[in-house]
Each structure stands twice: as C-alpha cells, then as structure tokens.
C-alpha cells in the first residue's frame, strides 16, 4: 500500500483519480480549497474504500498555502517502500490508517491536478486572475514537484503525475501556455529521473465532463463525441503511471487530435484555436 497526494481532489479528474487510487488500496492526502468538500469526500472514500485519508485545505494560488503542502511532501525518511501501483493483498484486510497515521507516511505518488480556466480575454481581463492561474498551474506544480522528488529519489521509488491538456499544443490563451509548460517540464523531468526508480508522467486529456468545463461555459459548445468520461481518463492515467509511461493522451480520437496539432502549420492552429476560444468564452 502506498500513499498518494492529489491536488484538485474534490472534482473532475482529480476526484476520480482519488477514488481509483483508494480502490487500489492507496492511502490519500487530498488537497483542495474548500475544507467542507474535502471532509465530505474524505469520509466517503474512507468508508467505502477502507483507506486512510488526510485532508489539506489549501489555495494553491497563495504561496503560504503551497508551502504547507510542500512541507507535507517532504515528510518521510529515505526507506524502501512498495512501488506505486502495487496494491498489497493485505491492504484491503487491514484497518484503515487514521488521518494522523497517513500524515506521517511518505508520499509515493504526487498528482498535480489543480487548475481552472481563466475564462477572459487577456488584453481586457483581470491581471490578478491571470496571476492566480499562473500560480496554480505553473508555480504550484514547480514547487510541489521540487518538494516531492528528492525524497522519492532517496527512497528509490515514486511517481509524479502532472495534468496538462491537449490544448498545450494550441494557442488558446494563457491556459494553453500554462499547460504547455507542464507538458515540457514533465518530459524534461522524466529524462532527468531516468534510472532513479522515480518516474514522471504527463496526462494530456481532451474535453472531460467536469465542473471545470461547466464553470468555463464550455459544456454546451461541443458535441457529445468530443467529451471523455473522467473515470476513463483517470484509469488511463494510472495505467500509464504504473508502466512508467511519460506521455499519456487518453482515447484514440485525442491521440489523433494530438498528432494533427503537431504536424499542422502553426498559422492554421492559431486560426482554429482563435475560433474555439470565442466559442468557449476565453
């Protein structure tokens, strides 16, 4: 049984990842802004999956909150552990760890999922909102990964799962820019970690049914065939982590989109992205 820390853990892909990790007998550290929702999710997961859950209410746009989560990632002495994804048979039989016990365990898997759509034109938008998005989707990913990796390397095992997007290859405003950074950063990290027993995986989902897209006003703008289910995305992501796969793009249709974006002239990509940005209220 390992321990996973998941940011953005109360909705969408992050919530589904938390559930699937719990079903594989991983203890959890759940991070999100709203304590009430965190406590509710933690209770549900602990009761139904029989694992220990610690919660950390943190706004990852605030440096002090990021520092608290980073401190949690540094917990644990260098000692051999169970590889990520290897659920021990004893996990289901043992009594769940308490939140205090979970808080003392080293983190085997860090999932950087927290993020949000800015939903405004850059030129006329609120710069404070842009800064907040940058802090959450770039700054926090950088800081939390930097906090987690040394201990994982010292223990000889661990994994980082960073959530990017197929929009990383488009030109859809600052959101796409943030996700492009996540993708490039994770690929570089994976190369750096080769041979250490620690892996880095970047998840590039397409449109996925969640509160994220509801808040961005995107739900009604795309046909049903364009949407993925969060449970399918999470399942593909965790399978990729267990294989040590660096890039995970769930579904054949988005693999095709990804390939087209890579070979299409950038001028064409910009025109298509500009049209999509208008439709999705960026």
Model regions: which residues?
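Active-site helix of classical SDR
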Residues: 145, 178
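Substrate-binding pocket helix/loop in short-chain dehydrogenase/reductase
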Residues: 121-123, 129-134
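Conserved glycine-rich Rossmann-like NAD(P)H-binding loop of the short-chain dehydrogenase/reductase
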Residues: 25-40
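Conserved glycine-rich cofactor-binding loop
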Residues: 10-12
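Conserved NAD(P)H cofactor-binding loop of Rossmann-fold oxidoreductase domains
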Residues: 113-118
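SDR active-site lid
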Residues: 190-256, 267
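Residue(s) in the substrate-gating loop at a strand-loop-helix junction
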Residues: 165
């Amino acid at each position: 049984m390992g321990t996973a820390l998941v940011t953005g853990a109360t909705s969408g892909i992050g919530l589904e990842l938390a559930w699937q990790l719990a079903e594989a007998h991983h203890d959890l550290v759940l991070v999100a802004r709203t304590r009430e929702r965190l406590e509710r999710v933690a209770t549900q997961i602990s009761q139904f999956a029989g694992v220990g859950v610690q919660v950390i209410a943190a706004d990852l746009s605030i440096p002090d909150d990021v520092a608290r989560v980073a401190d949690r990632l540094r917990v644990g002495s260098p000692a051999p552990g169970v590889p990520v994804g290897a659920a021990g048979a004893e996990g289901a039989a043992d009594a769940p760890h308490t939140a205090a016990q979970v808080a003392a365990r080293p983190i085997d898997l860090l999932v950087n999922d927290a993020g949000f759509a800015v939903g405004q034109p850059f030129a006329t938008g609120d710069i404070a909102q842009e800064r907040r998005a940058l802090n959450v989707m770039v700054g926090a990913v950088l800081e939390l990964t930097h906090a987690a990796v040394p201990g994982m390397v010292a223990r000889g095992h661990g994994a980082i799962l960073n959530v990017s997007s197929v929009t990383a290859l488009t030109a859809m405003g600052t959101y796409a820019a943030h996700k492009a950074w996540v993708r490039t950063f994770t690929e570089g990290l994976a190369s750096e970690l080769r041979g250490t027993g620690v892996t880095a995986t970047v998840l590039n989902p397409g449109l996925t049914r969640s509160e994220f897209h509801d808040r961005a006003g995107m739900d009604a703008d795309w046909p049903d065939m364009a949407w993925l289910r969060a449970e399918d995305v999470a399942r593909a992501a965790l399978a990729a982590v267990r294989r040590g796969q660096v890039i995970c793009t769930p579904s054949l249709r988005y693999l095709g989109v990804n390939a087209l974006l890579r070979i299409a002239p950038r001028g064409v990509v910009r025109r298509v992205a500009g049209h999509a940005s208008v439709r999705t209220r960026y």
